A protein has these predicted regions:
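DNA polymerase processivity clamps
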Residues: 1, 7, 13-117, 126-176, ...
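Short, structured "edge-of-domain" segments at secondary-structure transitions
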Residues: 177-181
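Short acidic (Asp/Glu) and glycine-rich catalytic loops that position anionic groups and cofactors
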Residues: 183-188
Length: 305
């Protein structure tokens, strides 16, 4: 058994746990490692495919990539994702929105390192290799207006430029010549979900807005409720919620979580929490599975807990 476990790369400490620990702990250790290894393998495959597709041909250039999408859907997706772009570009590429063109979907990503928004759209037609392009955030407004005015659009990206094309007009998109952080890595490294909360989006947003001046707001899940309180205060507000999994506590800067709620769609929002209070929390629109935000919580010792 030792040779088999070493053959799959299981760390020595985990091998000892499997061999010497109780069966329940051994199973949990192996399942956790399998999830991590699967994520790493997926990331490696996607990264190598992206790099291979981006390699130049014998003439030193790569073919343009085009995808055809619905204009109103593209406008909606850009409106949702772009608020996560950095307002102060200490890392210039974060002042942009990543458009990842693929064979089956167009994925849009923006982040300021404290929260990330990701939305995918199905494509009707595609040609050329998978290709990323980073569009300047201050050009997104014009792109939204252009997309909303056309039923179908072709997004064309070459080595030199990016263009939105309708049947009779086109819009050039200013791009940033920099590598966007790997959102695949972020998604692959998310910890296992230990609890899930479905809560009224408007009520949660209202309470967060009321507490917007606080350094941190603590959220605690219960059997059928979500409690909110200012960190350091024993009193708070209880909201009705549908909760599954463990009872969990985490804390956020109100403005960060509020930003994720503002761009969500539908009457309810879904929070997916890990057992580790300082790990990222996934925020989803309960009725829109193609849009995801990831919000970094506050370390409560840093917030004065």
């Amino acid at each position: 058994m030792i040779s088999r476990l070493r053959g799959i790369g299981l760390p020595l400490q985990d091998i000892r746990t499997v061999l010497d620990g109780p069966p329940e702990q051994a199973r949990a250790t192996l399942r956790t490692y399998a999830e991590q290894a699967t994520g790493i393998a997926r990331q490696a495959r996607e990264t190598t495919e992206d790099v291979i597709a981006s390699l130049p041909d014998s003439a030193g250039t790569t073919a343009p990539t085009t995808v055809v999408v619905r204009g109103p859907e593209l406008a909606s997706a850009l409106r949702q994702v772009s608020p996560a772009a950095a307002a102060v570009p200490d890392i210039p590429v974060l002042k942009g929105v990543l458009l990842q063109l693929g064979a089956d979907e167009l994925t849009m990503v923006a982040t300021d390192r404290y929260w990330m928004a990701v939305r995918s759209l199905p494509v009707e037609e595609t040609s050329g290799p998978d290709r990323p392009v980073v569009v300047a955030a201050d050009a997104v407004g014009a792109a939204v207006r252009f997309a909303a005015a056309h039923d179908r659009l072709r997004l064309r990206v070459s080595d030199d430029d990016a263009t939105l094309e309708s049947a009779d007009e086109e819009l050039g998109l200013p791009t940033l010549d920099a590598q966007f952080p790997s959102y695949h890595s972020v998604l692959a490294s998310l910890p296992p979900m230990a609890g899930r909360v479905t809560v009224d989006r408007t009520r949660l947003a209202t309470e967060l807005l009321r507490l917007d001046d606080a350094d941190a707001v603590v959220l605690t899940t219960g059997a059928d409720h979500l409690d909110l309180r200012v960190d350091g205060d024993r009193h708070g507000v209880r909201l009705g919620a549908i909760c599954t999994g463990e009872s969990l506590t985490t804390a956020f800067r109100p403005s960060l979580l509020l930003g994720a709620l503002d761009v969500s769609i539908g009457p309810e929002v879904l929070l997916e929490l890990s057992a580790e209070a300082n790990r990222p929390v996934v925020v989803r629109s309960a009725d829109q599975g193609t849009f995801t935000t990831i919000v970094m919580p506050v370390r409560r010792d840093d917030a004065g807990a």
